[in-house]
């Protein structure tokens, strides 16, 4: 605002009004910066002509001219110019105006700069003048300025037009002169080129005559077959020479088309002519060199032919036959006959070398004519493992065939290794099942449902067919061996030798063929430490936990219809004391007893829910719940009924342990730490046993250590 008012004072601007309150608003924001800000020309010169300023209207505010609001934000209306609203000082005489202390007033103290006071006085003098005189003066100045400016513009335009005409005339003369010079030079060049062409044609005719004479002499002495490659070579040379001549004529035509295009500068025209002449001379030299090279090649060929005719040898005959075959191949390639792949019978993608083509599908090169069919059928690769038992022997036979030959198998090795591993483990499991059945049949009678599961190896209780899901889960469960620490199978391949256990969160190496070190036969001395539990254990303290016998039918169904992972796997992690670490945990010893028994981790676990129960139970009193250790007495079936009664009595104490229906419950980290401490302290074991042969309800009895 400071600089605009300064310019308006010098150029007698029209931003003025009669109200004295606008002097306050007209000088707002003037003391913000000591130097005037440079404003663009929109605010200074263009507003001084006839029109009032657009961005800076007559300075008035909503409050009747007080300087609370900036003046350029308000429209120049008649309501604002007349004193409709009372002033700030009239409305609020006691409240000081906070904005006015930074602005200049007529009654200002003299400590402000003298320049601002002079500017303020000039603005007052301009505003006191009537606005009509300012408009008349501006209009008169514009009328005086307009004719002078108009005359100057006309003179400049006329001068520029004359200069342009002279330059255009000079350019036209120069272009005509250049075209004449170019035409003359091209005529000379064409004359020289015609002479050179005549000489070349004469040399070619002489050369052809010599070749014809040599051919006639050669045909008399040799057979007609030996002359065929020579004629083809001549024909190719003639075609190449004609092709070179055609290219040279096309270049000449392009050179002749050049002078029709207008050129602006003489120097560029001369340079272009010189370049064209140089190019033409280079082309002529190249043609001469080509002719000389053709002559040399023809002479050497003729010499070879004459020497071959004098002394024919079997080596030259073989070479000639090779040339004939290469020419036939060239004809095939020029005729664009693409052969088909000998492996996949699809069109070849490109030529690999002189004889072989490349197939994109096989990613190999092949020679058309030599068949190399793939030895392994692709159906075995692409087909998923749906019929598990049928595909495995096919793949095994195909791998043996491939290993007997030198060619590597196209099937990936990882799948074959996994399938071999699965086959070996299945055979090992079947052998162990048969050995175990032989042992148990001699000692005791096996329950019918257990015998059915052992014979089937799969849950086939409802006489249903073996589905695809069971086969897939069987293959996945067999591929991962059990962990030797926690005996869980939820693991994956960690590296070449080790597997990773989810439960232990540690990698482990499978011992032997998937057997853990705890599967060694246990000694009868350690078994004798744990005596069978009788009904006298009901007098234990009330702090011992017990299991509520609920969900009986659900437990039976879930134990029957478990996934094959749980049935083929050994029981999950069971915490044991050091004295009972070697005690077998096989579910087959639930209802009967064998004196010399080596447990098998790969047998189907009937008590999978009981094992998960043993995982989930950890009481606070330092009592451990171990796995499925067998009762020692021969009258175990009689004791089982008493166990159910004692379980019902213990359940009346209100201590509820985990539900039997959760097969996937796990220990927390804190409970694992406590159980590790309790192992070192030697806690009391809890024997979990089934009440009935149908595994309807189970209960764990925790006796006191002093009672037995």
Curated annotation (Swiss-Prot):
Sequence repeats lie at residues 339-368, 481-510. It is found in: Nucleus. Its main location: nucleus. Keywords: Activator, DNA-binding, Nucleus, Repeat, Transcription, Transcription regulation. Residues 591-600 have a biased composition (Polar residues). It comes from the Eukaryota. Residues 11-21, 123-219, 227-316, 516-590 have a biased composition (Low complexity). Residues 324-333 have a biased composition (Basic and acidic residues). Residues 1-29, 123-339, 511-604 are annotated as: Disordered. One of its GO terms (cellular component) is nucleus. GO terms for biological process: adenylate cyclase-activating G protein-coupled cAMP receptor signaling pathway; autophagic cell death; positive regulation of aggregation involved in sorocarp development; regulation of transcription by RNA polymerase II; response to catechin; sorocarp development. One of its GO terms (molecular function) is DNA binding. cAMP-responsive transcriptional activator regulating late gene expression. Essential component of the developmental switch between early and late development. Binds to a number of CA/GT-rich gene regulatory elements. This is G-box-binding factor. The gene is gbfA.
């Amino acid at each position: 605002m400071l600089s605009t008012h300064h310019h308006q004072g010098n150029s007698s601007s029209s931003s003025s009004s009669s109200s004295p309150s606008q002097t306050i608003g007209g000088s707002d924001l003037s003391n913000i910066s000591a130097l005037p800000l440079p404003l663009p020309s929109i605010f200074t010169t263009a507003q001084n002509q006839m029109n009032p300023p657009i961005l800076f209207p007559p300075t008035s505010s909503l409050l009747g001219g007080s300087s609370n609001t900036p003046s350029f934000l308000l429209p120049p209306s008649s309501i604002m110019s007349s004193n409709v609203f009372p002033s700030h000082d009239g409305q609020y005489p006691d409240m000081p105006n906070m904005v006015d202390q930074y602005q200049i007033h007529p009654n200002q103290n003299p400590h402000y700069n003298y320049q601002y006071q002079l500017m303020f006085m000039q603005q007052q003098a301009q505003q006191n003048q009537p606005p009509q005189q300012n408009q008349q003066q501006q209009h008169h100045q514009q009328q005086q300025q307009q004719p002078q400016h108009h005359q100057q513009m006309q003179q400049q335009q006329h001068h520029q037009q004359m200069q342009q005409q002279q330059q255009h005339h000079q350019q036209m003369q120069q272009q005509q002169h250049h075209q004449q010079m170019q035409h003359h030079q091209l005529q000379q060049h064409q004359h020289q080129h015609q002479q050179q062409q005549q000489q070349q044609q004469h040399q070619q005719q002489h050369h052809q005559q010599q070749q014809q004479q040599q051919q006639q002499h050669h045909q008399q002495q040799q057979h007609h077959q030996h002359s065929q490659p020579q004629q083809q070579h001549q024909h190719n040379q003639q075609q190449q020479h004609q092709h070179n001549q055609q290219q040279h004529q096309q270049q000449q035509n392009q050179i002749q088309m050049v002078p029709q295009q207008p050129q602006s500068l003489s120097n560029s025209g001369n340079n272009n002519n010189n370049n064209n002449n140089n190019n033409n001379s280079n082309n002529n030299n190249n043609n001469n060199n080509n002719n000389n090279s053709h002559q040399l090649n023809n002479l050497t060929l003729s010499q070879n032919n004459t020497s071959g005719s004098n002394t024919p040898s079997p080596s030259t005959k073989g070479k000639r036959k090779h040339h004939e075959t290469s020419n036939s191949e060239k004809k095939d390639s020029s005729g664009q006959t693409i052969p088909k792949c000998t492996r996949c019978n699809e069109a070849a993608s490109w030529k690999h070398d002189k004889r072989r083509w490349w197939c994109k599908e096989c990613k190999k090169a092949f020679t058309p004519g030599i068949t190399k069919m793939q030895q392994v059928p692709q159906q075995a690769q692409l087909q998923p493992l749906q019929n598990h038992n049928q595909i495995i022997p096919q793949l095994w036979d195909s791998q043996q065939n491939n290993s007997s030959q030198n060619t590597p198998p196209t099937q990936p090795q990882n799948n074959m290794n996994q399938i071999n591993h699965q086959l070996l483990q299945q055979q090992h499991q079947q052998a162990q099942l048969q050995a175990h059945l032989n042992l148990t049949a001699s000692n005791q009678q096996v329950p019918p449902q257990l015998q059915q599961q052992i014979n089937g190896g799969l849950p086939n209780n409802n006489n249903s067919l073996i589905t695809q899901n069971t086969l897939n889960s069987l293959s996945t469960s067999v591929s991962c061996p059990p962990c030797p620490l926690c005996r869980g199978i939820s693991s994956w391949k960690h590296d070449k030798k080790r597997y990773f256990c989810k439960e232990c969160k540690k990698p482990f190496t499978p011992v032997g063929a998937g057997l853990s070190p705890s599967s060694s036969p246990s000694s009868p001395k350690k078994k004798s430490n744990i005596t069978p539990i009788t009904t006298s254990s009901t007098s234990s303290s009330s702090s011992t936990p017990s299991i509520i016998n609920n969900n009986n039918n659900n437990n039976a169904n879930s134990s029957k219809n478990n996934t094959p992972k749980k049935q083929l796997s050994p029981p999950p992690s069971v915490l044991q004391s050091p004295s009972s670490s070697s005690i077998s945990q096989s579910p087959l010893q639930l209802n009967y007893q064998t004196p010399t028994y080596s447990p098998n981790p790969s047998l189907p676990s009937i008590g999978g829910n009981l094992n998960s129960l043993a995982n989930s139970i950890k009481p606070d009193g330092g009592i451990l719940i171990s796995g499925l250790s067998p009762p020692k007495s021969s009258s175990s079936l009689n004791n089982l009924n008493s166990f159910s009664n004692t379980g019902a009595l213990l359940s009346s104490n209100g201590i509820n342990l985990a539900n039997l229906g959760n097969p996937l419950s796990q220990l927390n980290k804190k409970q694992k730490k406590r159980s590790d401490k309790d192992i070192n302290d030697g806690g009391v074991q809890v024997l979990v046993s089934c009440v009935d042969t149908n595994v309807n309800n189970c209960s764990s009895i925790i006796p006191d250590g002093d009672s037995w």
